[in-house]
Amino acid sequence: PSTWQYCNNGPVLYGSLFQGEVYDALKDSEMEGWNTALYTPNESWKPAVEVALNGHISTSGNPNMPWVDDYSNYKLVGQFGQTVKAVNELTAISVEEVRPKVFVYDMGQNMVGVPQIQLSGMKPGTKICLRYAEVKYPDLPEYEGSIGMIMLENIRAAMAQDIYITRGGRETIHPRFTYHGYRFVEITGIDAPLATEAVKGIVLSSIHNFASSYETSNTLVNKLWKNITWSSSGNFLSIPTDCPQRNERLGWAGDISVFSRTATYLADVSQFLRRYVQSMRDVQRSDGRFPDIAPLGGGFGGLLWGSAGITVPWECYQQYGDKRLLNEHYDA
């Protein structure tokens, strides 16, 4: 519409699932209240321009999955399935200055989500860098020189880093356009450690509540149960992923093919899995084969991966007795 406007000078300078977020809080005042009816746009706002959809997309680039140039059959639909929301909150249990002005906070266990860090009295324009890791370098001879530092090798090409530029006064670091899988968060750019209670982790998931509980007299079995539910929560984030931390986080069909039955016992994931099965149909090959990865498409798995196009709808029906997914999916 001709009345639409846009602004490309807000505080979010960069946002990436793998690489993290860059946020300049010095720009907060310019955008304050922008999403309310009372907001009056300033000179930073420009008339929106309609741009033609040129070029093409590919469902995968694999054989039998041709380039897509015709978008006439594509349509917007309302979102369904469990949304991603905050389901838990952790507080750092310790902090260690592993190098001068390099502070590593321990959240107590691996988590999937974003930090929420309280600051006060910072000099305006201070650049604070946060990096995330699941483990630290252990005290072993081969890691001499790195002991105590966060280990990033298993994160691979993901930067897993957030940068926050302070405005001064009381403020909160709380990224919106990324997420991380981590236990340890390294903070640099501050002269002294923040109190552990100022460093929190907001746990995100598409599983809002678990429908099952399990407890025995064996503490190891109880811990295994907690590991299962915690890992399920961390890997059910919009899509069922293979991992929450490195430069992958993909909807590998083989993983959910073998786990879907367990998932249906743990929680009501009927709409979550319905959405995933639809994404499998969206990138289904012309010869009928389901992809190994959805919604991205492609992959290099075997029959087990594509079999999710059969096993997941069936497990949902077996658990929930709802035939709608079968009706939607049967022709595929």
Predicted feature residues:
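Extracellular/oxidizing-compartment recognition motifs
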Residues: P1-Q245, G254-D255, Q271-R274, F290-P295, ...
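C-terminal capping/lid segments that line or modulate ligand- or cofactor-binding pockets
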Residues: E21-D24, G33, N247-E248, L266, ...
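Generic, well-ordered alpha-helical scaffold segments in large soluble proteins
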Residues: Q118-S120, T188, N227, S231-N235, ...
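Helix-terminus loop motifs that line ligand-binding clefts
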Residues: L140-N154, S270-A332
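A glycine-rich, coil/turn loop motif that links secondary-structure elements
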Residues: Q245-L250, G299-G302
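An alpha-helix initiation/capping motif
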Residues: L250-A253, D331
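An alpha-helical repeat/solenoid feature that recognizes helix-turn-helix modules
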Residues: W252-V258, Y265, G302-G306
